[in-house]
From Swiss-Prot:
Name of the coding gene: nodF
Ranges where the Carrier domain occurs: 4-89
The protein, known as: Nodulation protein F
Superkingdom per UniProt: Bacteria
Entry function: Proposed to synthesize nod factor fatty acyl chain. Involved in trans-2,trans-4,trans-6,cis-11-octadecatetraenoic acid biosynthesis.
Post-translational modification: 4'-phosphopantetheine is transferred from CoA to a specific serine of apo-NodF.
Residue(s) carrying O-(pantetheine 4'-phosphoryl)serine: S46
Xref: InterPro entries: ACP-like_sf, PP-bd_ACP, Ppantetheine_attach_site
UniProt keywords, alphabetically: Nodulation, Phosphopantetheine, Phosphoprotein, Plasmid
Amino acid sequence: MVDQLESEIIGIIKNRVESEGGDGETALIVGDLTAATELTALGVDSLGLADIIWDVEQAYGIRIEMNTAEAWSDLQNVGDIVGAIRGLLTKGA
């Protein structure tokens, strides 16, 4: 079951991927975005991941302390991003 946080983060990722103008195949995947969706399937590279992280930081008023190389190895799918943000928000609460 998708909770509010996961739904919001999926929305942030969809907006970023759509604004980057992926191809038709990527658009189909974006329409069916779930926690299991791999970032590479969305056409997200390390720069795109940095943009997504920035978008999430702005949306939640948090700072994600990791360099792009660490993020790229740790955050492989949408669920990984949701889990990382959930952990940061829980710490801050």
